[in-house]
Amino acid sequence: MATAYIIGLGRSGIAAARLLKIQGWEVILSDRAHSPNLEITQQELGQEGITVKLADHPSLIDSNLPNLIVVSPGVPWDVNFLQEARDRGIDVIGELELAWRSLQSSPWVGITGTNGKTTTTALVAAIFQASGLNAPSCGNIGYAACELALSQTKTKASSFDWIIAEVSSYQIESSRELAPKIGIWTTFTPDHLSRHKTLDNYYAIKASLLRRCELQIFNGDDPYLHQVGLHQWADAYWTTVKGKEHLLCDAAKGVYLQDNWIVAFGELIAPLNLFKMVGVHNQQNLLMAVGAARLAGIEKGAIAQAIATFKGVPHRLELITNIDGIDFINDSKATNYDAAEVGLVSVNASVILIAGGEAKEGDDRRWIEQIKAKVATVLLIGEAATAFAQRLQQSNYEAYEIVETMDNAVKRGLELAKKQQAKVVLLSPACASFDQYQSFEHRGDHFRQLCQALKE
């Protein structure tokens, strides 16, 4: 029996293990961590015939080499163990690639980019589903991709009409055959450089996915993508919120805003006022989603209906509550400077900003410009608080307080908003969450709980 070794005991890894088990593989699941909860999972999977090794540091032993290694998205692609496995000719792939091998009879929409991926994925899925298509989403929202493959294998169901996949740079690295029918590239700015080393590397990884797609849609309002533009992507479809004259392509291949209408490939689709999400960046996301829908043959009426009923995505400029006329907004997904800058641009009022966490590399200057223009006080939390305070001071901005925790920040945020007549308390951290939380979702959920408790 062929042996598969899966690294990472998260949702993706467990789904991959179950899929391979059903397909007749001997499956070993490995994780570096060890905890009582993981021991429970170990026992449950053991009953399904899946071996789980905890506190495990895998090595390649000649007498017992696996035929396949499946890597979860959080595992660096260039660690020695995986490099050695590839050198020895072992098939090393990511969880998404494993799912693709089972699901490639369905057409995929693959959405990638530094920021905007998740909202665009949610919009595409909402529009496709509103038209009656069986089009589940996978990635950061919806299912793990292997969960979709598993459900189809178990039920022997017919193929999905479409699969809508959010694809990170980590997943592209480990998915050499993944080839969506429609590819969307939302934005491109420096991020994940601790893993990808250089901007050129990061761009090349993203571009490799788009080159395998049959049809490509690009955000023409993104400065970097606009710059590489037509000389690299001559056959692509382009979007812009700035009007037809700003398209990088012929209007017949463009999706754009004109006189507050959404226009796709020269045809009026829907009035923009149907769309309730704030921010120009969300209008950009919408245009890419509409482009994908029209390329998939979806009718205008279904698109308009989905736009009108779309409520947004948790942790992305999510309005939590209003207390005494002050909006509390959760933008926990803003894990870098560019996303946090967009969060501030999207709010048309004086702001109390909660920022900080585990800092990332990047250029913070435009973010700080927005702070100076919009923010009454910055409340700093987490590991980056001291460094952020110094950076703000260097920029001649002194209206900040180091409050350390989210509990302190939410309480203090309400006090200061009342005192300074700010209309919004915004969590938009510009940082990863791992210093204090398991994920940006965990951080955003905690913010939501604290806001709701404050209202009560």
From Swiss-Prot:
Question: What cellular component terms from Gene Ontology apply here?
Answer: cytoplasm
Write out the coiled-coil annotation as residue ranges.
Answer: none
**Which SUPFAM superfamilies does its entry note?**
MurCD N-terminal domain, MurD-like peptide ligases, catalytic domain, MurD-like peptide ligases, peptide-binding domain
User: Which Pfam family, any one, appears in the UniProt record?
Assistant: Mur_ligase_M
Single Gene Ontology BP term?
Answer: cell division
UniProt-listed Enzyme Commission number(s):
6.3.2.9
Question: Cell cycle among the record's keywords?
Answer: yes
- UniProt binding sites for ATP: 113-119
Q: Kindly tell me the pathway this chain contributes to.
A: Cell wall biogenesis; peptidoglycan biosynthesis
Name the keywords, alphabetized: ATP-binding, Cell cycle, Cell division, Cell shape, Cell wall biogenesis/degradation, Cytoplasm, Ligase, Nucleotide-binding, Peptidoglycan synthesis
Q: Does the keyword Cytoplasm apply?
A: yes
Alphabetically, the GO molecular function entries are:
ATP binding; UDP-N-acetylmuramoylalanine-D-glutamate ligase activity
- What is the superkingdom listed in this entry's lineage? Bacteria
Q: Which family does it belong to?
A: Belongs to the MurCDEF family.
Identify the HAMAP family for this entry. Answer: MurD
Record function comment: Cell wall formation. Catalyzes the addition of glutamate to the nucleotide precursor UDP-N-acetylmuramoyl-L-alanine (UMA).
What is the name of this protein? Answer: UDP-N-acetylmuramoylalanine--D-glutamate ligase
Q: State the species of origin.
A: Rippkaea orientalis (strain PCC 8801 / RF-1)
Gene behind this chain? murD
